[in-house]
Amino acid sequence: MAVPKRKTSPSKRGMRRSADALKAPTYVEDKDSGELRRPHHIDLKTGMYRGRSVLTPKNSG
């Protein structure tokens, strides 16, 4: 069984754990529709991605 040769310092332990925190998702305002969407994701209401129609838009209702 592997055993650490040295004790992990509190600083190193904290640096390792710094990536574990949950972060709020970021949103950007769409240039065309003004709706909020995730960056680098398809706008599901319009079906557009980077100015191109990728999906058929969802019908509201």
UniProtKB/Swiss-Prot annotation:
GO MF annotations in UniProt: structural constituent of ribosome
Gene3D superfamilies the record matches: Single helix bin
Coiled-coil positions: none
Biased composition (Basic and acidic residues): 28-44
Annotated Pfam families: Ribosomal_L32p
UniProt-annotated stretches for the region Disordered: 1-61
Annotated Gene Ontology cellular component terms: large ribosomal subunit
Entry's Gene Ontology BP terms: translation
Keywords attached to this entry: Ribonucleoprotein, Ribosomal protein
Biased segments, Basic residues type: 1-16
Membership in a protein family: Belongs to the bacterial ribosomal protein bL32 family.
Protein's UniProt name: Large ribosomal subunit protein bL32
